[in-house]
Amino acid sequence: FDYWSPGTIVQRAVTGAVMEQLRVQVNGDFHSFEFKGQAKELIDSASFQAGQGGLQAYPEEPQLGGFDYSIVPGHIGQVWIGSPAKRFYTLTEADIVIKNNIDTRDREFGVDGPACVSAGVRQVTVDFAVYEQDNIPTRELYEAAKNRAPIPVMLQLGNQSGAMFALYMNAVVPEVPEFDDREQRLQWRFSGCRAQGVYN
């Protein structure tokens, strides 16, 4: 839904929504979540008729909970890579994309909008960058990339109870990194790393 003030202006909502893609971006300043997908129908308060979206009346705006507009606590996070897992303190950025490859039945003759959805083979890709260091975990990460050996990766966003999000991938195949020397410290950029999983 999408509500605006005053309540007499056009409000909008979608029905039958399905998530096609989730993108999680992390860097030293902020974390962001981006959701993309399709919906069966867009309804609005200006042209709503009973029965649209299976509703008899346009939905009222939900009551807002208390919000003090303060900064979300626990911005600091952790990243663990490898087997056995080792904590990395040199991550500068990460971009994780989960794509469901949804197929909508919307190409049949005479059908107005998607009739249903079918999930495809999920794709999970990871891009990340770390500062180069002369230590065993960093060397092992490079060796895993060179040998195309799957490794576990875990990202924890936040460090306070009630304000945390974790993303765990059991088998990520790292690509050989690009050496980025645009700054004073050398960064290794791993792009297009694929997470492996089970198909059922």
Predicted features by range, described:
Residues 1-200:
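Signature of extracytoplasmic/envelope-associated structural regions
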